[in-house]
UniProtKB/Swiss-Prot annotation:
At physiological pH, 3-nitropropionate (3-NPA) exists in equilibrium with its conjugate base, propionate-3-nitronate (P3N). FMN binds at N74, Q181, G186, G223, Q242, L243, G244, T245. It is an enzyme of class 1 (oxidoreductase). One of its GO terms (biological process) is response to toxic substance. Belongs to the nitronate monooxygenase family. NMO class I subfamily. Keywords: Detoxification, Flavoprotein, FMN, Monooxygenase, Nucleotide-binding, Oxidoreductase. Nitronate monooxygenase that uses molecular oxygen to catalyze the oxidative denitrification of alkyl nitronates. Acts on propionate 3-nitronate (P3N), the presumed physiological substrate. Is likely involved in the degradation of P3N, that allows B.phytofirmans PsJN to grow on 3-nitropropionate/P3N as the sole source of nitrogen and carbon. Also probably functions in the detoxification of P3N, a metabolic poison produced by plants and fungi as a defense mechanism. Cannot oxidize nitroalkanes such as 3-nitropropionate, nitroethane, or 1-nitropropane. Gene3D superfamilies: Aldolase class I. CDD domains: NPD_like. This is Nitronate monooxygenase. Binds 1 FMN per subunit. It catalyses: 3 propionate 3-nitronate + 3 O2 + H2O = 3 3-oxopropanoate + 2 nitrate + nitrite + H2O2 + 3 H(+). GO terms for molecular function: nitronate monooxygenase activity; nucleotide binding.
Length: 366
């Protein structure tokens, strides 16, 4: 096995100038955000896992109208949900008092609100027609036939991995680069099997392991908020860093005032894992919903993404009464370093900090 030296160069492969990738962040990223990052020399991304095929086509075209640079479209490759009426009703009963607190009633029945890319031929058809430069996968991988079709269309492919075993699957599938998602990352863990043991490797350890053991270029992700973090990732053997939380407070995102206020305030100092909001483990700033899930009396949530149907309904009920504490306030462990800047300014600042960090490290080279 080799280190990153001698591997295919990632930046020209993706058509970018800077080793800075804005994480896709379904529900947060917008065409304006992705295009601004692209136009500043990084790789902008859009998460379409929460959209149908028509919605994905729309945002791809909107982004193309704002930039002629390559951008990344991300999909969810989770196992399609298996409904369990008993578990779902128990979960709704647990949430009912919180709905009542805000003058609402829980849904009578929950729905599977997100179609997995594994079972979405319409989304594949959109990609083959629109041909975004890059498509990335989270929660797993599509079939070999789907990967072959995307590659035949000239689309570059990325996939998240949280351990060496998943990285080996990514490599064997013919994907172009691996996103090494450390435990520090905000949002959903990208594990392929949520029921399997999770090594919970940190970004430093995972990036170094994959850089040494894998033939593919590695992109470090998780807890990276500034140029110093990017420099550290590059020193560990990554060819780029993917930043999510760092971009959440950018002016181009779609977050509401409660999420923005939390990220730029004291709430950003504490993040926690919860499955209560969506039915799948994700890192969020601690809030009323994460506390609800941490209650020892809490039953098992409905499965992902069925539980998200209830989570979104409760958040909407609370927001209607001016309470923002039930949102999916996804954030990484270093969220307290977030800055509210236009995306282009943030990319420029990250590049300056990266160069400063590299220069500071030169003193140790003598």
């Amino acid at each position: 096995m080799t280190d990153q030296t001698g591997k295919r160069a990632l930046l020209p492969l993706l058509g970018i100038d800077k080793p800075i990738i804005q994480a896709p962040m379904a529900g947060v990223s917008t065409p304006a955000l992705a295009a601004a990052v692209c136009n500043a020399g990084g790789l902008g991304s859009l998460g379409v896992g929460a959209m149908n095929a028509d919605g994905a086509r729309k945002v791809i075209r909107e982004t193309r109208a704002l930039t002629d640079k390559p951008f990344n479209i991300n999909v969810f490759c989770h196992r399609p949900a298996q409904a369990d009426a008993a578990v779902e009703q128990q979960w709704l009963s647990w949430l009912a008092p919180h709905f009542e607190k805000y003058g609402a009633t829980p849904p009578a029945k929950l729905s599977d609100i997100y179609t997995s890319f594994l079972a979405d031929p319409a989304m594949l058809a959109v990609f083959l027609e629109e041909k975004p430069a890059i498509v990335s996968f989270h929660f797993g991988l599509p079939s070999a036939d789907v990967i072959a079709e995307l590659k035949k269309a000239g689309i570059r492919l990325l996939a998240s991995a949280t351990n060496l075993q998943e990285a080996a699957q990514v490599e064997a599938a013919g994907v172009d680069a691996i996103v090494a998602q450390g435990i520090e990352a905000g949002g959903h863990r990208g594990v392929f099997d949520p029921d399997a043991f999770d090594d919970r490797l940190g970004t430093f350890a995972l990036t170094r392991l994959l850089a040494k053991e894998c033939r593919l270029p590695v992109i470090a992700a998780g807890g990276i908020m500034d140029g110093a973090g990017i420099a550290a990732a590059l020193a560990l053997g990554a060819q780029a860093a993917q930043l999510g939380t760092a971009f959440v407070a950018c002016t181009e995102t779609s977050i509401d005032e409660g999420y923005r206020r939390a990220l730029l305030g004291e709430a950003a100092r504490r993040t926690t894992f919860t499955a209560a909001i969506s039915g799948r483990l994700a890192r969020s700033m601690a809030n009323s919903f994460t506390a609800l899930g941490a209650d020892p009396r809490s039953p098992e949530p409905a499965t992902y993404p069925i539980a998200y149907d209830a989570g979104k309904a409760l958040n909407a009920a609370a927001k209607a009464k001016g309470e923002f504490g039930y949102g999916a306030h996804w954030a990484g462990q270093a969220a307290a370093l977030a800055r509210s800047l236009p995306a282009a300014e943030l990319v420029a600042q990250l590049e300056r900090e990266l160069k400063q960090s590299i220069e500071q490290l030169r003193q140790f080279a003598n």
